[in-house]
A protein has these predicted regions:
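Cleavable N-terminal export/targeting peptides
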Residues: 1-36
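Transmembrane beta-barrel domains of Gram-negative outer membranes and organellar outer membranes
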Residues: 27-189, 199-309
Length: 309
């Protein structure tokens, strides 16, 4: 099973290649059509423009060999895998509805904790362009997500009463460059069960060709207010879980900052094929800049397909 998961980026790429063989490539005519979606922090880091698409994403994350707890450095190792299908529907260039988090999680540590799998919490919301200037290739958008606590507790979902996640995102194009960033908060409705966090993500990419975009991304999560959940992991962990998991840690402020950097690319497989506008494949390799023991990530491989319509 682990081998199959590791091969998923190749499977997605092979599927894209098949679609590419039947694709029709024409010049993009819509404003901002040449810009790409970020790859990492898939739950909270979205593009600023309002566009319609289906997004299939797989994130395979190696867990640290040891994690920081009130009992000392506890062995963990193993991996976490998230597979999700996300969607956005744009009513116009100013407004869209978003299904941002709905997927399946495999949590398979080698030590201390049990292997488990289950459904992630569902998050949905909307996005509105506060400033929209195609001639300057500049957008500023506001987004509001609501997460519902219906997921599987076995994989650290379903705790609390959900949360609200407001954010502001900008996009700026310059020649062949794309710059993008977001700043937001995760505000739990039950402060005892989930931590409040502030996050920021940044993206820079360059159109090496009209189809190929090397990229760099940076993500930062900061615990603004720790929770007080009594579950075993939450009661001893000295950190929070990052973008996918909110542990509700009683000691999240001990190591409140979690920062990662990622390098990767997007490849535009086709443009304008029938009712579809374009299909993009993305891949990124991500590493923590903070101590890996103070989180749940030793490294992460993210691969996705984005089908615009």
């Amino acid at each position: 099973m682990k081998g199959t998961i590791r091969k998923l980026p190749l499977i997605l790429l092979a599927a894209g290649a098949v679609l590419f063989a039947a694709g029709i490539c024409v010049a993009a005519e819509e404003p901002f059509a040449r810009f790409i979606k970020p790859v990492t922090n898939p739950v909270y880091f979205d593009e600023a423009q309002n566009v319609s698409y289906v997004h299939v994403v797989n994130a395979y994350q190696d867990l640290p060999k040891r994690i920081s707890t009130k009992l000392g450095r506890v062995p963990l190792d193993g991996h976490l895998n998230l597979t999700a299908v996300r969607a956005t529907y744009a009513f116009n260039e100013k407004f869209s509805l978003i299904a941002a988090k709905d997927g399946y999680i495999d949590f398979k540590p080698e030590h201390t904790l049990e292997h488990d799998s289950g459904w992630g919490d569902i998050a949905a919301g909307f996005k509105y362009a506060l400033y929209y200037c195609p001639q300057d290739e500049f957008i500023v958008s506001g987004k509001l997500l609501f997460e519902f606590a219906q997921g599987s507790r076995e994989v650290f979902q379903g705790n609390g009463d959900g949360n609200a996640a407001p954010s502001v995102t900008f996009l700026k194009g310059y020649d062949k460059w794309q710059f993008m960033g977001t700043l937001g908060m995760i505000i739990p409705f039950n402060a005892k069960q989930e931590s409040m966090e502030i996050y920021q993500s940044y993206h820079v990419s360059y159109a090496l060709t009209p189809r190929f975009f090397p990229l760099l991304e940076l993500n930062h999560f900061c615990v603004a207010r720790q929770a007080d959940r009594e579950e075993l992991v939450a009661s001893i962990a000295e950190f929070e879980g990052g973008d996918v998991i909110n542990l509700g840690s009683q000691h999240g402020i001990d190591h409140r900052n979690f920062v990662t950097v990622a390098a990767g690319f997007r490849y535009r497989i086709f443009e304008k094929a029938g009712v579809f506008k374009n299909l993009d494949f993305g891949f990124a390799y991500e590493l923590p800049l903070t101590n890996p023991n103070d989180g749940l990530m030793d490294n992460r491989y993210t691969a996705d397909l984005v089908l615009h319509f």
